[in-house]
């Protein structure tokens, strides 16, 4: 019997020590009744330099075009290449593949070699901008991957390109 009295006394003691916490609904109604306005939670998105560079990259034409039988990078494509360089600087683990392409004129062997020179020329510009050449792969498809199959100068000019593909 004494054991039961001790247990009941201990439970009453613990119950008297407990504090009452208001339910979440009570505090909201108190704030609303006091006239204060409660703003809803605003979610803030953190934007990193890598995210900005990726967004800029997504809105950039990923090709550099060349004149007939040439592999010199024209000044008008400096901005395109710079966007890829910014992306690679912002995301250190990123890699790039540059695919050289040609129009259908010339032999298969000649166009494969010219496509490789085009890809290598774009890579050289990126390396001159401080990008590690080991992060850039070049390949030539020659005339095998045309964008336009129309045999005209307009069609040919679209096929003389180096495509930049981030990975």
Descriptions of predicted regions:
Residues 2-8:
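Sec-dependent signal peptide recognition
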Residues 13-16:
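C-terminal motif of bacterial Sec signal peptides marking the signal peptidase cleavage site
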Residues 18-95:
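Periplasmic peptidoglycan-binding/tethering modules of Gram-negative envelope proteins
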Residues 60-61, 159-161:
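A structure-centric signal for secondary-structure junctions around beta-strands
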Residues 71-79, 105, 109-117:
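Soluble non-cytosolic domains of exported or imported proteins
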Residues 92-101, 116-147, 160-167:
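A non-catalytic structural micro-motif
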Residues 149-152:
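Short beta-alpha junctions and helix-cap segments that line functional grooves
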Residues 154-158:
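A generic structural micro-feature
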